[in-house]
């Protein structure tokens, strides 16, 4: 039986086409992936991401506990700030990538990938000791993401909080949005400005409908996971199971900014990551652009000078750039920009070239 989010009852009203994703029945699109993608790049779009996992970590031992598990330096957080980080196993394979919200002195909220929630909770529980309390609040929490250049203007109609004062990777809890008590976070997964809004599950429909009503004149569209994927891909934001996995390290995925190999005491996987940092990771995530006609897809093999060199992690025809592009994990020695490679597309080796990433970066307003 697939899980459903608190917004499932209103999907049909907005024309949702649903698919299975990580054990959930989720909307892949409402109008079309291209339309929704372009709405977010030029106006704004509203996503239901209530399938994501939320885990609370509390108690006097919270900080040392998180420091032991996280690749980033959690001590740098302050109440009201958000940090991107990862958890690794001893061999530096990625357990998950996540966001940490510091709510109070010994009070943290971890937001993890939907398909990994149970695995992550078990991993955290296995390593918890001392004064640490863990609580999985995913079932009672809804999460909506309003993303795009018009996001602030639209959301401001529904709240007295001055949204312009909220910096990226900051949040405020207990904010009334359309009379719904909400945690408002300036974060997202699209490469655009935007907000992620956490509320009680029973308030999700009220909040969803209020935002779409407030955004009607700005052309805000309900958006599905299809556009979420093309948007995050153009911005080169990793997706667990594709750019990250138990066999892909954060350094191979190009996430060195979130890996603090000098941290003391060391975190799980730190020794291997330190070696990778010093020697250079054996593989690197690169951007590829097709020269021949064809679309690189997840799992397609990549060749360089006739030898197998890696595989495509994500690929599509970019709605913004109108090019056939992909991300690929390849041997470090063939990862140079300008390197010509071949992608095996249905038995044919088609030419591509390694290009700079991210493919898309929004202009700073």
Curated annotation (Swiss-Prot):
Q: Does the keyword Cell wall biogenesis/degradation apply?
A: no
Q: Which reaction does it catalyse?
A: N(6)-[(R)-S(8)-aminomethyldihydrolipoyl]-L-lysyl-[protein] + (6S)-5,6,7,8-tetrahydrofolate = N(6)-[(R)-dihydrolipoyl]-L-lysyl-[protein] + (6R)-5,10-methylene-5,6,7,8-tetrahydrofolate + NH4(+)
The main enzyme category here is transferase
Answer whether the UniProt record assigns the keyword Transferase to this protein.
Answer: yes
- GO MF assignments: aminomethyltransferase activity; transaminase activity
Keywords for this protein: Aminotransferase, Transferase
Q: Which domain of life is it from?
A: Bacteria
Q: How does this polypeptide assemble, per the annotation?
A: The glycine cleavage system is composed of four proteins: P, T, L and H.
Q: What is its EC number?
A: 2.1.2.10
Where are the disulfide bridges? none
Q: Name one GO cellular component term.
A: cytosol
Descriptive protein name: Aminomethyltransferase
Q: What does this protein do?
A: The glycine cleavage system catalyzes the degradation of glycine.
Homology family: Belongs to the GcvT family.
The GO biological-process annotations, alphabetized, read as:
glycine decarboxylation via glycine cleavage system
Species assigned in the record:
Geobacillus thermodenitrificans (strain NG80-2)
């Amino acid at each position: 039986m697939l899980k459903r989010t608190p917004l499932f009852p209103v999907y049909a009203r907005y024309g949702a086409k649903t698919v299975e994703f990580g054990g959930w029945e989720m909307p892949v699109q409402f109008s079309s992936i291209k339309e929704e993608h372009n709405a977010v790049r030029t106006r704004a779009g509203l996503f239901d991401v209530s399938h994501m996992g939320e885990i609370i970590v509390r108690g006097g031992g919270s900080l040392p506990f998180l420091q032991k598990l996280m690749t980033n330096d959690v001590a740098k957080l302050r109440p009201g700030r958000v940090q991107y980080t990862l958890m690794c196993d001893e061999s530096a394979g990625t357990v998950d990538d996540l966001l940490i919200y510091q709510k109070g002195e010994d009070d943290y909220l971890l937001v993890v990938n939907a398909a990994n929630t149970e695995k992550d909770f078990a991993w955290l529980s296995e390593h918890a000791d001392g004064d640490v309390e863990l609580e999985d609040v995913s079932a009672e929490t809804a999460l909506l993401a309003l993303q795009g250049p018009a996001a602030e203007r639209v959301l401001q109609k529904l709240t007295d909080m001055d949204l312009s004062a909220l910096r990226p990777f900051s949040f405020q809890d207990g904010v009334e949005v359309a009379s719904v008590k909400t945690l408002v976070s300036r974060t997202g997964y699209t490469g655009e400005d935007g907000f992620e809004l956490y509320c009680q599950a029973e308030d999700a429909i009220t909040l969803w409908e209020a935002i779409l009503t407030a955004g009607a004149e700005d052309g805000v569209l309900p958006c599905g996971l299809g556009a979420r994927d093309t948007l995050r891909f153009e911005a080169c934001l990793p997706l667990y199971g594709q750019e990250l996995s138990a066999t892909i390290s954060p350094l191979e995925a190009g996430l060195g900014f979130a890996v603090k190999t000098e941290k003391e005491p060391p975190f799980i996987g730190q020794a291997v990551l330190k070696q990778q940092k010093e020697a250079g990771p054996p593989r690197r995530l690169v951007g590829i652009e097709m020269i021949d006609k064809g679309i690189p897809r997840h799992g397609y093999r990549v060749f360089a000078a006739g030898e197998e060199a890696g595989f495509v992690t994500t690929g599509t025809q970019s709605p913004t750039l109108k090019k056939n592009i992909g991300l690929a994990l390849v041997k470090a020695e063939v990862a140079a920009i300008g390197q010509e490679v071949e992608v095996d597309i249905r038995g044919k080796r088609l030419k591509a070239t390694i290009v700079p990433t991210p493919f898309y970066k929004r202009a700073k307003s």
